[in-house]
Amino acid sequence: MLQSNRLTIYAIGKIKKHWIRDGINQYKKRMPELIINESKTFNLDNLRSNNNIIICLSEEGKQFNSVELCSLLLNFKNKKINFLIGDTDGVSSDIKEKSDLVLSLSPLTFPHELARLILIEQIYRAISISNNSPYHRS
């Protein structure tokens, strides 16, 4: 079973659009253990400690459907999973190279703030799939 207490989202910058913040807060109420860390930079050395998994979001990344994403996250067993979301310029090629996985949410391009909301919804969906809850309909 996938649990939100093993998942952290690291994002560059703060959410400025209130409607995106409201959407994120709705999912945070459902997953209060999920950590969202807003900062100015990523410290990969700290994120890499204890053999944590680093998943970087980028439009050039690998795409999964929701069930595949759930399976991927479940395969990481008891490891802590850190998602990295860049700012308007994305993330550097150095961070992409050092990540365990570069993930794309869609072939479409999204503003970085909206990508956070979409990622959080997909995390909630993956947890729901792993718990056999009715949220996800195949």
Swiss-Prot record:
GO terms for cellular component: cytoplasm. One of its GO terms (molecular function) is rRNA (pseudouridine-N3-)-methyltransferase activity. This is Ribosomal RNA large subunit methyltransferase H. Its EC number is 2.1.1.177. InterPro entries: Alpha/beta_knot_MTases, RlmH-like, tRNA_m1G_MTases_N. It is found in: Cytoplasm. It is an enzyme of class 2 (transferase). Keywords: Cytoplasm, Methyltransferase, rRNA processing, S-adenosyl-L-methionine, Transferase. S-adenosyl-L-methionine binds at L57, G86, L105, S106, P107, L108, T109, F110. Specifically methylates the pseudouridine at position 1915 (m3Psi1915) in 23S rRNA. It comes from Prochlorococcus marinus (strain AS9601). Belongs to the RNA methyltransferase RlmH family. Its main location: cytoplasm. Homodimer. It catalyses: pseudouridine(1915) in 23S rRNA + S-adenosyl-L-methionine = N(3)-methylpseudouridine(1915) in 23S rRNA + S-adenosyl-L-homocysteine + H(+).
